[in-house]
Design a protein with these regions (language model features):
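Active-site rim/loop-helix segments in enzyme catalytic domains that contact anionic ligands
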Residues: 1-102
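Metal-dependent de-N-acetylase/amidase catalytic core
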Residues: 1-5, 86-231
Length: 231
């Protein structure tokens, strides 16, 4: 895989959901870019940190990316945490990002309801998944969608695959080795403002990767719904 773009709603989404996959791609030599739509300033439970939460979470995400070996991190501006909607403006911003980065593969959040998981049903997650879907097809590949982007040198681009997480079904598992799992754990532990008990969170992460990998004989895994946009 030449270029992988992860598009997520909040700091920590990439690491909790796909940290092992992102670090594996980076280790194998792919260009890996992570984009975060909000700064997560409505997250956490410490009211004393609220005024600084966005700044703190950006720093946590930078350090988490370092743990994964991801060297390119993009933060969007103007999209408040907890208030993301599938707007025309956000579609345009993601189309511009796709055309700039030119990924073969996008990792993102599912736009579907998943009644088995409270976390997966965060409205920002579903909104980002819906916008990525609309941006990938047809807008990013259509020269007549957002024609002003052509003036910025952002030519149409076809994303070959999108892998969604958090939805009600999966059809693809990425194998993780122990190094991938350890990098994911280190990345998640950088998000100190979000998890009151980091040891408990680490145990949950380790169990989740074991559960995803075990049916396939893997040390660990991460599950996705894989969408091939080429047909």
């Amino acid at each position: 895989m030449d270029t992988v773009l992860g598009i997520y709603a909040h700091p920590d989404d990439a690491d909790v959901d796909a940290g092992g996959t992102l670090t594996r791609f980076a280790r194998e030599g792919a260009r890996v870019v992570v984009a975060v739509v909000t700064d997560g300033d409505a997250g956490g439970s410490d009211q004393d940190l609220h005024q600084r939460m966005g700044e703190l979470r950006r720093g946590e995400q930078r350090r988490a990316c370092e743990q994964l070996g991801v060297t390119e991190l993009v933060f969007f501006d103007g999209y408040p945490d907890g208030m993301v909607t599938p707007s025309h403006a956000l579609v345009r911003d993601i189309v511009a990002l796709i055309r700039r980065v030119k990924p073969n593969l996008i990792l993102t959040l599912s736009p579907e309801y998943n009644w088995s998981s409270i976390y997966a049903n965060h409205p920002d997650h579903r909104a980002v998944g819906a916008v990525v879907t609309d941006a990938v097809y047809p807008a990013a590949r259509n020269p007549f969608a957002f024609p002003e982007l052509l003036d910025e040198g952002l030519d149409p681009h076809v994303v070959e695959e999108v892998w969604f997480q958090g939805g009600p079904s999966t059809n693809h598992v990425v194998e993780l080795d122990q190094a991938d799992i350890e990098a994911k754990v280190r990345a998640v532990r950088e998000h100190v403002t979000q998890f009151d008990d980091l040891d408990r969170m680490e145990s949950w992460i380790r169990q989740g990767t074991r559960d995803a990998g075990k049916p396939h004989g893997y040390a660990g895994g991460e599950e996705f719904f894989r969408w091939d946009t080429r047909g």
